Amino acid sequence: MDSSKRQFLQQLGVLTAGASLVPLAQAKFSFSPERHGGSTQQRYAMLVDLRRCIGCQACTVSCAIENQTPQGEFRTHVNQYQVQVADKVTNVLLPRLCNHCDNPPCVPVCPVQATFQREDGIVVVDNTRCVGCAYCVQACPYDARFINHETQTADKCTFCVHRLEAGLLPACVESCVGGARIIGDIRDPQSRISQLIHTHHDAIKVLKPENNTAPHVFYLGLDEAFVTPLMGRAQPALWQEV
């Protein structure tokens, strides 16, 4: 960590040492922060069709290679959960990533405005500004953020924005064996994602809707147990050593 970031954290600690804690819901944060980058004509979102996901972790591996995340740290992964409904216990595969919310709670808590939302809805981190305080990590209700132990800055899925801007698909979408991940512009009614959302409107779900974050990762075939606060206990990923 460079000296300017270290000095900022020291000053932040002095300022907050004697401060009273205020619940986030009562804090005077703006949940409509200024957006920049991207185009207002687009709104990127992802649809995950769980009927097609086989848990192969190709998305996890390709993302790690594309974005060069440190070993053991991932921007996306597929968790396996056991869910009990009545007397029946089933295993459920659930791909997890940043939800690129319309009301992202990670943005207003950043003391240096390193986390921001682009005009096209993609939430990104400016690593040149991030001081690694981890406020955004704690604020994210989806556990989609982590502090990269190599860069000492916040890290997360960006929908591979560098690839989107080059006319390419995100690494996870391109590598998905079952074609379970679909990304596109939901402001374009002719886009594949828009048509799928329209066709399966009643079956489309999001994680933790009670948080009112307006997530833009949609799930098709999601078990009802995951719509309410996450139930079921995460098992080790199938490809990891335990």
Regions found by a protein language model. Give the residues of each.
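Non-ligating segments of multi-cofactor redox enzymes
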Residues: 1-242
